Amino acid sequence: MASDSDTEEFFDAPEDVNLSCSPAVSPLKSETFILKEEATYSKKAETRNIELKQDDSKEIIDSIIEESQKCSDTENENPVVEEKTEVLHETLIGDSVKTKQDLLSNIPELVVTESTFHDGVEDPLQQQISEYLEPDISRSQDAGPSADSAYVPSAIENIVDLTQDLKITEELKIAEEPEIPLIQEETKDPSKNIVEDVFSKLPTSDIIEQLPPAKPPRQICVEPDIVASTKKSGPNRPPQPINAPPPRPPPPARPAPPPRKKKGDTDFDRSSGFEYQKDGFLAGGLLSPNTLTENMNRDSQPSLDLASATSGEKIVTAQENGKAADGQLSSQSSECLGPQRPRSNSGRELTDDEILASVMIKNLDTGEEIPLSLAEEKLPTGINPLTLYIMRRTKEYVSNDAAQSDDEEKPQSHQSETDGGKLKQKTTQLKKFLGKSVKRAKHLAEEYGERAVNKVKSVRDEVFHTDQDDPSSSDDEGMPYTRPVKFKAAHGFKGPYDFEQIKVVQDLSGEHVGAVWTMKFSHCGRLLASAGQDNVVRIWVLKNAFDYFNNMRIKYNTEGRVSPSPSQESLNSSKSDTDGGVFSGTDDVDPDDKNAPFRQVPFCKYKGHTADLLDLSWSKNYFLLSSSMDKTVRLWHISRRECLCCFQHIDFVTAIAFHPRDDRYFLSGSLDGKLRLWNIPDKKVALWNEIDGQTKLITAANFCQNGKHAVIGTYDGRCIFYDTEHLKYHTQIHVRSTRGRNRVGRKITGIEPLPGENKILVTSNDSRIRLYDLRDLSLSMKYKGCVNSSSQIKASFSHDFTYIVSGSEDKYVYIWSTYHDLSKFTSVRRDRNDFWEGIKAHNAVVTSAIFAPNPGLMVSAETSSEKQEGDQAEPVENIPSGALKSDHTEVLLSADFTGAIKVFINKKKNIS
C-alpha cells in the first residue's frame, strides 16, 4: 500500500510550467489521436506501468467509475462509438498474449484522459493531458466556448458506452487472460470489472495501422508517472551490453573494530601510562603474518629452531613486506647511483679541504659553529664511527671540555662572561681548582703505598697520552690478575663501599683489533659475545662449559663442513674454531691462572659483516643476532659456523632485540627512522612503524614488560613506546633535564628493562642514566657520575638488579646501587643518586661494561674443580642453570676503545 507521504505528494504536486494547455478539438480527432498515441508510446508506457504503484491506480480507477456512472445517466449514445465497439469486439477475441500485454500498458492513458475531461480546469493533470490532445488553434478559436462544452461531454459519453457494450466479452476475456482475475481478486470490487473490460478491448496494432495518420505531436514527451512526477528522478542508466560479463559482486563490508574493554580497577587514568599487574605481566599474543593474534601461554612458549631459521631465503630485504614505505624505495634508488663529488660554480670538482671547509657544524653546548676541517681538534677522544656519521648528518657535535663536566655550571659561566661578570667566573674556577686539589691530596694520603704509585703512573699516562696509541702500556702488564684495581668513590660518599675489593681475574686482550662496541651474555651466562670495529663476532665460553657446547656442535655435525650460503665470506669461521675443538678445557691457558673463568681463545668467530658491529642479541636457545653499520642484521647459531640468514636494511642498524617470549621475532631499529618487527621463519617484516620529528634517527631499541611493548630511543632524546601486537604508537617520554645544558634532549644510547618492577633504565648522551616508572612515566631515579657525551655507551643491571654499571669516556667503570641504602645516608634525595663507585682498569674509553647473569658459574672455579676431582660431579652435558650461586659475589666485564676485555670478580664482605 502506498504511504501517506506518497498520497500527499500526489495531491500537492505543483503544476509543470513547461506544459501549456491546448484548445479542445472535435471528438473524432480526439479519439483518433488517442489511439495513434497509444500505439506510438506503447513501449514507454510499459516501463511506466511497472513503476506505477497499485494503490495509486486503484484510486484513479475508482474516481473514473464514479464519474462515468454519473455521465452515463444523462448522455445519449453516439453511433460512431457503437460502430467502433463492434470492430473492437471482433478483433480482441483473436488477439495473442503479447498484444494483450501491450494493450494493458495503455491503461493509464485512458484513465488520465477521462479523469481530465470531467474534473475541469482545476485538475492537476489538465496540462499533462493537453500534450496528447494536439489542438487545431484556428478551429478552437472559431468554435469558442460552446464548442468546448459540446466536445467534452461527448468524449465521456463514448467511453461509458464502450464499457457497457463490452460487458458481453467478459467471460471470454477471463479465459484467455489469467492476469486480469488476479487483479480482481486483489481489489474485490465488482464495480471495477467494467473498467477492466474496457482496457482488455482496446484497439490492436492492426486496427491502428488502418486508421488515418494523425497530426504529429507538438511536444514529444512521455506521460509522466503521477507519483514519480512529484519525486526526484534518478539518473538514467545506459543499457547493459548483450555479451557483457556479469557485474562484479560488491566488496565485503569492512568489519567493525572490536569494542574497547573497560578499564579495570588496576588501570591508571593517565592515558600515557602503562597497565600495572600485580601478578606479573599477561602473556599477550604477538601478531604473525598467518593469524591476527597468537595467544601464547607461559608454560608453552614458541621458540626458534634451526629448521625454520635455515629454510627459505638466505638474504631478506626490508621491502619484501608489500612495499613497506615509499621512502625506502627512493633511498635505495639513490644509493645505487653512488655519491657524487660536489663541484664549484665553474664546474670544477672540489678538493677534500674545500669540502670540509664548506661544511659547518654547531657545538650544542656553546652554540659555536666551526668548519668541519677544524672540528677534529675539538672532538672528544675515542669517538665512535656511528657518532661521526650522525654528526655529519645532523651537523652537531659536543666539545671535549663539555663531556668532562659533570655539573651544570659551565654554560652559566659562559653566559656570565658575555654579560661582563668575569669576577664571578674566576671565583667559580678558583673554587673548582681548590676543590680538586683538596680532593687529590686526600686521595693521595689514603692511597699510600701501592695505590699512590698507581696514581702517579696513571697521571703520567694521562699527561703523555701514551695509553691511547700503545695498548701495551697498560698498568696490568706483568702484574698478577688478582691484584686490586684502582678504586674511587663520589665526593661525599663516605662508605661503606661494595666494590672496594674488586679484582681483575682475566684479561682477554689481543683478540679484537680496534674498539669493542658491544658485549652480551647468553641467557644461561656461559657464553659471551663481543663485537666491534674489526667486523668480527667473537664467542667466548666458560672453561667448565666448553665440552657441553663442543658436543653440541659435533652433534649437529657442523664441524668440518659448512652449509650453502650466498656469501662465501660468511661461511668459514676463523682457524680458532678448529683449534678450539682439539684443546681441552685448561690446556690453552696459563696453568698457574686457575681463577680465569673463560677460555683464553674464543670458542668461534663469525665473519661476514663489512663494517663496525653495533649491537648483539641472544635468544633462549643460543641463536645470536648481530647488527652492523653495513646496514644488515645477521643470524647465527652456536652450533653452526655459517651465517643462517641476512636481513638487509636501508641504513645503519643501531639496535636489535629478540622477543623475550617468542624468539621467532626480533626488533630492529635503524637510522632510517623505521622500527621493524621481523619474522625469522617467514623471512619477512611482520610489522613496522616510522617515527616522526626533525631528526628521524633511532639509536636504541628494546622490549619492555616481558614483550608487551616495544620501546625505541631517538637522537633527539625521546623514548617512544609501541604495543608489540600491532606496533602502534602508545606513548613517549622526553628524556631531558628541566634546566641547565641538559634541558635539550640528547641521544638515547641504551634502554634496559627492570623485570618485576615495571621500570626501564635509559642511558643518554647527557652523561645521565635515568630510571623511569612505566605506570605513570615518572622519573624514579637519576644517576650521575659517568661521562657519556658522544659514545654509544649503555648502562645495565646486575644479575639480581641491585646494581647498575656503565662505561665512561674518562676510562672508569661506574657502579651505582639501584636504590639508596638509607642506612648509609642521613639525608639524601630519593630521586637522585650521585653516590657512585668507580673502577680504573683501562687506559682508554670504556665502551662497554656488563654484569654476568650467573656469577656462581665463574666465582667457584677453584672449588668446582676440586669437587670434580674428588666427587666426580655431574656430566658436563647437563649443566644446572643456577649451580653454585653466591648472593654476595658479582662478576663484571668491561671493554675499551683499544679492544681490551677484562674480567672482574668482587666478593662482598659478609655483614653479620
Curated annotation (Swiss-Prot):
<feature type="repeat" description="WD 6">
    <location>
        <begin position="787"/>
        <end position="826"/>
    </location>
</feature>
<feature type="repeat" description="WD 2">
    <location>
        <begin position="608"/>
        <end position="646"/>
    </location>
</feature>
<feature type="repeat" description="WD 7">
    <location>
        <begin position="841"/>
        <end position="880"/>
    </location>
</feature>
<feature type="region of interest" description="Disordered">
    <location>
        <begin position="206"/>
        <end position="352"/>
    </location>
</feature>
<keyword id="KW-0963">Cytoplasm</keyword>
<dbReference type="Pfam" id="PF00400">
    <property type="entry name" value="WD40"/>
</dbReference>
<feature type="region of interest" description="Disordered">
    <location>
        <begin position="559"/>
        <end position="594"/>
    </location>
</feature>
<feature type="repeat" description="WD 1">
    <location>
        <begin position="511"/>
        <end position="550"/>
    </location>
</feature>
<keyword id="KW-0333">Golgi apparatus</keyword>
<feature type="compositionally biased region" description="Basic and acidic residues">
    <location>
        <begin position="410"/>
        <end position="422"/>
    </location>
</feature>
<dbReference type="InterPro" id="IPR020472">
    <property type="entry name" value="G-protein_beta_WD-40_rep"/>
</dbReference>
<feature type="repeat" description="WD 5">
    <location>
        <begin position="743"/>
        <end position="782"/>
    </location>
</feature>
<feature type="compositionally biased region" description="Basic and acidic residues">
    <location>
        <begin position="264"/>
        <end position="278"/>
    </location>
</feature>
<feature type="repeat" description="WD 4">
    <location>
        <begin position="693"/>
        <end position="732"/>
    </location>
</feature>
<dbReference type="InterPro" id="IPR040324">
    <property type="entry name" value="WDR44/Dgr2"/>
</dbReference>
<dbReference type="GO" id="GO:0010008">
    <property type="term" value="C:endosome membrane"/>
</dbReference>
<dbReference type="InterPro" id="IPR001680">
    <property type="entry name" value="WD40_rpt"/>
</dbReference>
<keyword id="KW-0472">Membrane</keyword>
<feature type="repeat" description="WD 8">
    <location>
        <begin position="882"/>
        <end position="912"/>
    </location>
</feature>
<feature type="compositionally biased region" description="Low complexity">
    <location>
        <begin position="563"/>
        <end position="575"/>
    </location>
</feature>
<dbReference type="InterPro" id="IPR015943">
    <property type="entry name" value="WD40/YVTN_repeat-like_dom_sf"/>
</dbReference>
<dbReference type="InterPro" id="IPR036322">
    <property type="entry name" value="WD40_repeat_dom_sf"/>
</dbReference>
<feature type="region of interest" description="Disordered">
    <location>
        <begin position="861"/>
        <end position="882"/>
    </location>
</feature>
<dbReference type="GO" id="GO:0048471">
    <property type="term" value="C:perinuclear region of cytoplasm"/>
</dbReference>
<feature type="compositionally biased region" description="Polar residues">
    <location>
        <begin position="288"/>
        <end position="311"/>
    </location>
</feature>
<feature type="compositionally biased region" description="Pro residues">
    <location>
        <begin position="236"/>
        <end position="258"/>
    </location>
</feature>
<keyword id="KW-0853">WD repeat</keyword>
<feature type="repeat" description="WD 3">
    <location>
        <begin position="648"/>
        <end position="688"/>
    </location>
</feature>
<feature type="compositionally biased region" description="Acidic residues">
    <location>
        <begin position="469"/>
        <end position="478"/>
    </location>
</feature>
<dbReference type="GO" id="GO:0005794">
    <property type="term" value="C:Golgi apparatus"/>
</dbReference>
<dbReference type="GO" id="GO:0005829">
    <property type="term" value="C:cytosol"/>
</dbReference>
<comment type="function">
    <text>Downstream effector for rab11. May be involved in vesicle recycling. May also be involved in the inhibition of the intracellular ciliogenesis pathway.</text>
</comment>
<keyword id="KW-0967">Endosome</keyword>
<feature type="region of interest" description="Disordered">
    <location>
        <begin position="399"/>
        <end position="426"/>
    </location>
</feature>
<keyword id="KW-0677">Repeat</keyword>
<protein>
    <recommendedName>
        <fullName>WD repeat-containing protein 44</fullName>
    </recommendedName>
</protein>
<feature type="region of interest" description="Disordered">
    <location>
        <begin position="460"/>
        <end position="481"/>
    </location>
</feature>
